[in-house]
Amino acid sequence: MKNLKQILTAMYLCMALAAAASPVRQRLHDDWQFRQARLNNWYPATVPGTVHTDLMANRIIEDPYFRLNERGVQWVDKEDWIYETHFEAGADLLARERIELVFEGLDTYADVYLNDEKILTTDNMFRRWRTEVKRLLRPGENALKVYFHSPIKVDLPKYDSLPYRYEAINDQSANGGLFDKRVSVFARKAGYHYGWDWGPRLVTSGIWRPVYLEGWNGIRISDVFYRQEEVTAERARVQVEVEIDAVREQPRAVVTVTAPGEGIEASVTTPLRPGVNRVTVPLDIASPKRWWTRELGEPHLYEFRTSVAAGDASDSRTTRIGLRSLRLVREKVSDGTTFRFELNGEPLFAKGANYIPCDVFLPRVTRAVYEKTIDDAAAVNMNMLRVWGGGVYEDDVFYELCDERGILVWQDFMFACSIYPAEGAWLENVRLEAEDNIRRLRNHPSIAVWCGNNECNDAWFGWGWNARYTKQGHPEYDKIIDTQFKRQYYEVLPEAVAAFSPGTPYHPSSPWSCYEGTSENSEGDTHFWKVWHSRAPIADYNTTRSRFFSEYGFQSFPEYASVLRFAPEERDWDIESEVMMAHQRGGSFANMRIRQYLEDEYWPARDFRTFLYMSHVLQGDAIKTAIEAHRRDKPYCWGSLFWQHNDCWPVASWASRDWYGRWKAQHYFARPAFDDLLVSPCTANGRLEVFLVSDRRETVRGKLETTVLKMDGTVLSKNTRSVTLAPNAVRKVHSADIAGLLHGCSPGEAIVVTKFTTGGRRYSNIGYFAPQKELALPEADIRWSAEPTAEGYAVTLTSDRFVRAAWLSLDGNEHFEDNYFDLLPGVGRTVGVSTKLSRDEFDRLLRITHLQQTR
């Protein structure tokens, strides 16, 4: 018993010593208050947070997302704001040799005071700020104050001082009362805060990411980089580069890397000098479990623990790593240059969307929102998201979820559709921003490529910006800006990627194929906007080629239940109403453009609610057409990322999911279009052609069934054949003369149903022989029944005639597992829905809408 007590006492002392030796953190998120700098009234504040959300919480402004309220809050960005808190530093923290104050994010121009002494001045929303504060901290109460300067007042003098203009095409300066003074280019701040063609102008400020005190004794791990030199099925060679801060010289430090449960361990012993030390621990892993995108395999993650011990000081850090090799293959071929990603030696067709921030007020984006956003991408078979350059480098949780779900990330640097003053202090600020974020994100297996910007290269060379001042007699201004442009995107940013994430591809701009020119379809990536912006017909998606489509899109409105959330008044329910025009930022013509396309491709909607539904079907059909065309064009084309996955506020936009998280038709249509096997019927030159597309790593064998039906279910022709398809290949598996298939039936009265069955799973698709507006859609008798399930109900629909785009809704947040689907005559379709509605409520609220009803 006595020995047991001695052992327990010794264990306790060891644990206590280890705890005392390890770094500690004290979060500073409590008891904040804020005020307008020129006024004296203090109000409670939330940290992390923003000025706008704090003003809303204190009922000083109304929700700017509701109706026209955005207009009434434009004064906020012209004011300075002060945030303040008082705190007591813990005794354990105060006992540490080094103590730093760390702000993970300050938006944007701020002075920080601790106990009335200025300790920090910031000018970049995207950087982490840390400063030594031990000498200033007191036992008892301490005062921390952050003075936020108006980004407008800081940057207007910069704009006024220049004889030339830096362009920023999406900056909604007029909405902010600044006329044409687009000052967003001067701030290292999220560009979309100043407005975009899908977002409001809400230029906010605040402590937008966590703030804390960090104290440590002796040593601290400041960074760990798992540099993967070689990853194959047989072995993985990894150099673990550990950065250690040491207060004083340490003659002997042991640095250890382990993967508990995986049988992986390695260590080195080294002396440490005062300051920053870099130590490398080599790992050699036999038969590694590699990380794959979700359709190619398992996205396996190792949990590595890096620890350092020197005397009585120690620190450790845990990092989840996916072992994989990834290349961006850009090889000269006879008809251009390839542009494809290769994962673990396998060519990968990128399927996904462009991602924008989930809110203008970023601290409101919870983990649950991130989870739904990424899960919704995975649910429709996406394997890549492009983090667009006008937003932010996302929170860690975003990349962690992509790692877990097997989704690659195309990561833009935060520059978009603008030209920036890239010289001097600005450029050094950008360099530090790049280093900060590359270091933070480089261990994520999901990071596939760093891209210099969004559309800046196109803007400078393709939109005429590079010759504007030459035409005005001042070519020297164009030369100045061109030099700055080249320095930022062709020197500073690629040098940062090479230095801090060697081996990760860098792409100068999106779209891009060469420096002095816009993108070419035979090389690089393409933003294809002739459909929509240039009013080209949707059918043009079938004939336009590119190596990689990194943007294309089509607009729609949110559904009716979503519209009611931000526009509940009946007078708003018109696409030309003031509210609907305010919640459309794609130009004053954009709502009319949806209507024009609708009337060109379908027919006029009879009322507002019908218009919303039809806009979904129109958008879904358009993007489905594009995705299938891109996939049929493999191996010329290797990527299809539509614009866009999400919204940052309630708005008519190109998003496949609205701001409330409701799926539009486009999102449902993306699931089969992005599946690992696609059967794709199309018509051209009087022939029906059926293509089979595989993204699988193995040969596929199965049965293809092609059936031509009349709308009442009468079979006009049927063909069944066995098909073998090589790995990662495309094959035309059926071709027939359309006239021979229809047997005299009008093209508008028939459909083609294609089904491919392999391994017990069926892949199907429906095609048409006539444009949608020429389809002779019949009146149909739809019947439905519902059976209770653990989550809600399973709803089964049947119809005596073909039904186009059946949409099930409950006018709530309920999500149907499938929707906007075509019903074949006499063939039942069962879909599940999660809901807590009683059976009586469900029966009363269920609404079934289909295209036949809209004429």
Residue ranges with predicted function:
Residues 1-13, 20-384, 632-633, 637, ...:
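Secreted/periplasmic carbohydrate-active enzymes, especially glycoside hydrolases
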Residues 351-353, 385-387, 409-411, 452, ...:
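Hydrophobic faces of well-ordered beta-strands that scaffold small-molecule active sites
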